[in-house]
């Protein structure tokens, strides 16, 4: 069962103001407190595809009259609500509107909210890293950070060498970013062996296919060789760019001297 909000109809809002002035004949013999609270509460219930509308009137935290679409009329909950129920039920046109509220209010607003939520979709961004320097044969924590996604329902799984991991996994609940998007952290306790490939597998309604991000276990020496190779490549590209710039300037200088 889910409960859906329903906007207050104009006539109900006007009636709310009217009800705040309590009928003296109803509360005769009682002293109206200096400060009191009146509340009109509207609910939509959806159960197995069927909508039900409930409207409650509450005075100082005590419900005194109620409309339930399953009943079709207002019913007093306390003695205070008897005259209000009689008055509400005498308003035939307004009563018919209440009886139709499961379709005209609940169903309409639910379908509208669903369309709006489906139009707000953001694909997740996924980043995988160890909590500390990845050393082979040492216990570590692998972190899969999934950010900037909407809606908030998401599935994140861990795989090691194409086999799903089911133990040593911890996850946060989806965390609101302050706008309308979410983020989540899912960690995996592991002791990496040479050649191990860990994969963070993310499924989300915004994606046509899952996002998979890999992290490969490697020794410090292999990592250093990789970094050295990358550094050498970057340095070579820098020298190449400088050489090209000097060559172009030299050509321009030769043309200018002619």
From Swiss-Prot:
One cellular component (GO) term of this entry: MHC class II protein complex
Glycan attachment positions: 224
- UniProt lineage: Eukaryota, Metazoa, Chordata, Craniata, Vertebrata
Q: How does it sit in the membrane?
A: Single-pass type I membrane protein
Region annotated Beta-1 sits at 30-121
Residue ranges annotated as Cytoplasmic topological domain: 247-258
BP GO annotations: adaptive immune response; antigen processing and presentation of peptide or polysaccharide antigen via MHC class II
Residue stretches making up the Ig-like C1-type domain: 124-212
Q: Where is this region: Connecting peptide?
A: 216-225
User: In this UniProt entry, which cysteines form S-S bonds?
Assistant: 44-106, 144-200
- What name has this protein been given in UniProt? SMH class II histocompatibility antigen, beta-1 chain
Q: Which Pfam families match?
A: C1-set, MHC_II_beta
Keyword field contains Repressor:
no
């Amino acid at each position: 069962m889910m409960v859906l909000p329903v906007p207050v109809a104009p006539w109900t809002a006007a009636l709310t103001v009217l009800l705040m002035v309590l009928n003296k004949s109803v509360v005769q013999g009682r002293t109206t407190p200096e400060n009191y609270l009146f509340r009109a509460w509207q609910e939509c219930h959806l159960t197995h595809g069927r909508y039900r509308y409930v409207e409650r009137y509450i005075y100082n935290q005590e419900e005194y009259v109620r409309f339930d679409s399953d009943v079709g009329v207002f019913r007093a909950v306390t003695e205070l609500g008897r005259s209000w129920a009689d008055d509400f039920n005498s308003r035939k046109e307004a009563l018919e509107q209440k009886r139709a509220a499961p379709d005209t209010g609940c169903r309409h607003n639910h379908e509208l909210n669903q369309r709006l939520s489906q139009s707000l979709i953001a694909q997740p961004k996924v980043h995988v890293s160890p909590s500390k320097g990845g050393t082979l044969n040492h216990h570590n924590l692998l972190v899969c950070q999934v950010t900037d996604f909407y809606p908030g329902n998401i599935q994140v799984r861990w795989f090691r060498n194409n086999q799903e991991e089911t133990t040593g996994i911890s996850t946060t609940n989806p965390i609101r970013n302050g706008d309308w998007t979410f983020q989540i952290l899912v960690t995996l306790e592991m002791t990496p062996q040479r050649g191990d490939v860990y994969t963070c597998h993310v499924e989300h309604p915004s994606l046509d296919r899952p996002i998979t991000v890999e992290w490969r276990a490697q020794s410090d020496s292999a990592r250093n060789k990789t970094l050295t190779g990358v550094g050498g490549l970057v340095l070579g590209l820098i020298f190449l760019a400088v050489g090209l710039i000097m060559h172009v300037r030299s050509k321009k200088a030769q043309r200018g001297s002619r």
